[in-house]
Amino acid sequence: KPADLTEEDYSKFYRELYPYGEEPLFHIHLNVDYPFNLTGILYFPKVKNNIELQRNKIQLYCNQVFVTDSVEGIVPEFLTLLHGVIDSPDIPLNVSRSYLQSDGNVKKISSHITKKVADRLQEIFKAERQDFENKWDSLKIFINYGMLTDEKFYERAVKFNLFKNTDGKYFTAEEYKTLVESNQTDKDGNLIYLYTNDAEQQFSYIEAAKAKGYDVLVMDGQLDVHLASMLEQKNEKSRYVRVDSDTIDNIILKDNAATVELTANEQNALSSIFKAELPEDKDNNFWVSFAALDAESMPVMITQQEFMRRMKEMAATQGGMMSFYGQMPNSYNLVVNTNHALIKRLMNNAQQSVGEKVAPIDSEIAELRNIVDSINAANKDKKDDEIAETDKELIKNNNDKIAQLEKDKEALYKDFAKGEDMVRQLVDLALLANNMLKGEALSNFVKRSTQFI
């Protein structure tokens, strides 16, 4: 009986079962006589971030006769991460695994163990919250796994599942919602939960979020991405977004968001200039976008869109249909801060260098587009087979000319970029901030930086 045992007794028994194992976090003593008979002791091990290596540690007995230590399908999947012994005369001997899995008593036992585990965790959380928080890093993967795979456990665990922020503070879901709801709800009513999976690597993004008064969670566990997706499904108008997925103003859009004041031609020019120096390889795709950030913010930064990155991360552990995403190249966005002094200087340099050559090209493109627009306007109420072939041919020829002129203009900006060290330096700074600058490119950056100094 539990009342007859001391903590030392439980520890001694664990060492007998697992002589080379680390001391467990704590234990649960099962002692049930209705509606079935069951005794047992389950231990919470210090779970590592490798689920597969932690299974098959529960020994199943019937009247002290060993039945199996492979309990998947007999107890809920997440409970296979526990260690310990279960003994019940209601578990039939000498039967197949499939029979055990479908046996009514076994199902009741499984459900009861799930409830006892959840109740024990809730009890520890309420009575010894500080101790619970201290052990959270070891408990986390176990609890998250249970929430993802067992709906009844999820319903209980949501009360004691914890979130840790970058300041090292712990919160329940309800506590954290109360903390951030007023400040991190966007203009469409979505509550945005910001998170990082690497606080050191994403430091600058975290600081940008904190500068806005936002809070950032640490979600660096093996199952955190999967849990975030499930929580989004269960909680309407809530989104989990990594801090480096976009500029902070775009992640949490407000009604007073600043707008980019560059013209379309100016944006195209800067886009061509930066594309000329961005890495080109089959595993990574880059595109350029613009944001009107604070003048003190970084001139350029690299972000990775939340949805595609999350799908690739989930594909790495799930496989199956998700493997489609795993085979796709990484997609990155170089965000240009149009309010930064360096970007304004770069735009002026480009104008002085190639502006006279670009101006007549822009004029010719504008004329050709006016012609195309006029023809389309004249034919807007006609079906395709009613439009004169001469009009179709003229539209095609003019569009071909426009495409070639755009290429000519892009080539001018590309040549400018190759001769402007500032462009390469800005791109490399953004890559370096994302730990994406390596090898020869990193060496060249260091040499160039020395010359700038």
Where are the model-predicted features located?
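Conserved GHKL (Bergerat-fold) ATPase module
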Residues: 1-453
